[in-house]
């Protein structure tokens, strides 16, 4: 249900010309379904749409902190995203490691703008690296919800848009009571 709230805020905050060429990106296999929901929300014939996804190539010979490290993000989709606004959608940002790799890969493919759509922005490693990437022009914004705690100081960042889901949650509670 956060999809509609995030989309509404996104559309209301962007100039119409930024919505003409959209590339919907899944940062991994688990996010393909979510990517497709966003892709199908823009069914207008006046919008040029692309879809892409990344596959995480892991080093299965080394276990680091209980995980097999990602050694490369392999991209499947249009290799030239010149002029496209890329929308990367996932359930959450935990540390942000994969998102940083995805941003770099999309910039190599000439994405004009990059926005991240996530239901939960946990920022487990803080936001310093997000500040750094924003200052370097690696992404243009993160759209997330208020369904997880986001410190007030983080909410003041120009790149962070916190979408209010309280009405939707209240409706769900009301309709199931």
Summary of predicted features, one role per range:
Residues 1-177:
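PRPP-associated nucleotide enzymes
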